[in-house]
């Protein structure tokens, strides 16, 4: 059985969990927090979550996990089979991650954890986020889903990066 290692506040863990649920793949959720111990690093080389336990070993990094799930659970596709459409969805996923999620993270310390963020960092984040959403507006279809008429991995990434 697959084992998803992560914790509920991690948007990346939540992306993998939703993909597992959408694909109808049985899995065990193992509440896990990042560590830097040798034992943990043997399963997750950067000491991060999520990572996925499979019968063959461990897979780390969300993109790699999502690709694996797509390959082992073909009954419910979350990426188009057509190469052009698949590349478009992958491009949207990367745009959301790099140009929306990543800039927003620079303000997480203040937004979620009681820390403070300088005005310069907030200003840069705002500028980058506006550019990121402008990019998404030009590229995404939202008809009704991010990439068009079908729910895909781009919708999962959007949900946990924007909501």
Locate each region found by the language model.
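GST-like domain detector, emphasizing the conserved glutathione-binding G-site
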Residues: 1-130, 144
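Alpha-helical scaffold segments in carbohydrate-active enzymes
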Residues: 91, 95-98, 135, 159-162
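GST superfamily/GST-like fold recognition
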Residues: 104, 146-163
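Short, highly charged low-complexity linear segments
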Residues: 124-132, 155, 161
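Hydrophobic alpha-helical bundle segments that form small-molecule/ligand-binding pockets
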Residues: 133-147
């Amino acid at each position: 059985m697959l084992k998803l290692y992560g914790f509920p506040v991690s948007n990346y863990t939540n992306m993998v969990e939703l993909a597992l649920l959408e694909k109808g793949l049985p899995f065990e959720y193992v509440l896990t927090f990042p560590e830097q111990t040798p034992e943990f690093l043997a399963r997750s080389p950067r000491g991060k979550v999520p990572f996925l336990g499979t019968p063959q070993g461990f897979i780390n990094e969300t993109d790699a996990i999502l690709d694996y799930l797509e390959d082992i659970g073909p009954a419910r596709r979350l990426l188009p089979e057509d190469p052009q459409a698949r590349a478009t969805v992958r491009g949207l996923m990367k745009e959301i991650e790099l140009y929306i999620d990543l800039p927003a993270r620079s303000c997480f310390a203040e937004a979620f954890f009681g820390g403070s963020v300088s005005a310069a960092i907030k200003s840069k984040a705002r500028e980058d986020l506006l550019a990121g959403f402008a990019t998404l507006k030009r590229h995404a279809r939202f008809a009704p889903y991010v990439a068009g008429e079908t729910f895909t991995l781009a919708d999962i990434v959007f949900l946990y990066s924007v909501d």
